[in-house]
From Swiss-Prot:
Cellular component GO terms, alphabetical: cytosol; small ribosomal subunit
Protein function: Located at the top of the head of the 30S subunit, it contacts several helices of the 16S rRNA. In the 70S ribosome it contacts the 23S rRNA (bridge B1a) and protein L5 of the 50S subunit (bridge B1b), connecting the 2 subunits; these bridges are implicated in subunit movement. Contacts the tRNAs in the A and P-sites.
A Pfam family reported for this protein in Swiss-Prot or TrEMBL: Ribosomal_S13
Gene3D superfamilies given in the database record: 1.10.8.50, 30s ribosomal protein s13, domain 2
Protein name: Small ribosomal subunit protein uS13
Region (Disordered): 93-122
Organism this protein belongs to: Micrococcus luteus (strain ATCC 4698 / DSM 20030 / JCM 1464 / CCM 169 / CCUG 5858 / IAM 1056 / NBRC 3333 / NCIMB 9278 / NCTC 2665 / VKM Ac-2230)
Database matches in InterPro entries: Rbsml_uS13_C (IPR027437), Ribosomal_uS13 (IPR001892), Ribosomal_uS13-like_H2TH (IPR010979), Ribosomal_uS13_bac-type (IPR019980), Ribosomal_uS13_CS (IPR018269)
Subunit structure: Part of the 30S ribosomal subunit. Forms a loose heterodimer with protein S19. Forms two bridges to the 50S subunit in the 70S ribosome.
Residues making up the signal peptide according to the UniProt record: none
The encoding gene: rpsM
Keywords per UniProt: Ribonucleoprotein, Ribosomal protein, RNA-binding, rRNA-binding, tRNA-binding
Amino acid sequence: MARLAGVDIPREKRVIIALTYIYGVGKTRAEETLAATGIDPNIRVKDLSAEQLVQLRDHIEGSYKVEGDLRREVAADIRRKVEIGSYEGLRHRRGLPVRGQRTKTNARTRKGPKKTVAGKKK
């Protein structure tokens, strides 16, 4: 396996897909990176030369925040919102959806499994 930005990327996959295994690199950034380095997106990772891997590593680490740095920045942003007491911070603290989604129904991913409430007797 080749290592880029501290991540083992799969050798058998096409480069454009393999780059998306790095946190902070999606399909668009993978395309931009390959265009900037002049590497064919359809080539397999195992077929890349050492020089091409170095080019990819330098471009990704030089141009984007990825992996640990990005995770730390996101966590710090959330922590800051919680500390200043903003509405978004409140939603994070309560474990509810942050971006205005409905919660009367749905939102089960954020709220967790249903808490059963005893029904009213007739």
